């Protein structure tokens, strides 16, 4: 269970860093938002899901 928790935290941190860099790049590009909004929404949904997963796994471990 600890390995699953560690992998979930790593995935959350990785997704956060990707979104931290990717979202401003999408907004700065000329037609970035209209062509990449599905990717941004998918990444945001993944991030929210990982936050809940880490919370659930944390409650099971402690």
From Swiss-Prot:
It is a multi-pass membrane protein. Disulfide bonds: none annotated. The keyword Transmembrane applies. GO terms for biological process: photosynthesis; photosystem II stabilization. It is found in: Plastid, Chloroplast thylakoid membrane. Keywords: Chloroplast, Membrane, Photosynthesis, Photosystem II, Plastid, Reaction center, Thylakoid, Transmembrane, Transmembrane helix. It holds the Pfam family Ycf9. The chain crosses the membrane at residues 8-28, 41-61. GO terms for cellular component: chloroplast thylakoid membrane; photosystem II reaction center. Gene3D superfamilies: Photosystem II PsbZ, reaction centre (1.10.287.740). It comes from the Eukaryota. Coiled coil: none annotated. May control the interaction of photosystem II (PSII) cores with the light-harvesting antenna, regulates electron flow through the 2 photosystem reaction centers. PSII is a light-driven water plastoquinone oxidoreductase, using light energy to abstract electrons from H(2)O, generating a proton gradient subsequently used for ATP formation. Belongs to the PsbZ family. This is Photosystem II reaction center protein Z. The lineage of its organism: Eukaryota, Viridiplantae, Streptophyta, Embryophyta, Tracheophyta.
